């Protein structure tokens, strides 16, 4: 978030957020799975979105919750003439699928 305080954000700045409402990144990368029960202390269930963040910093904001809306959101994000955020809402289970799709871009 600190980087958004820059008063001269480039118009080609595009941010993609995978929001699974918990911090499930630790289930997608190697290492934390070796911690066993400690993994539950590395997640923080929440109901926050990035929409207010985008409004505060005057960024474009797009959202979606399916692979189809992800593709449409990517098109909007790429075509946007301003610094923008694309927020994809996923479940913990589908988070890995979205992440895999994103890595193929």
Language-model regions, residue ranges each:
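Thiamine diphosphate
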Residues: 1-105
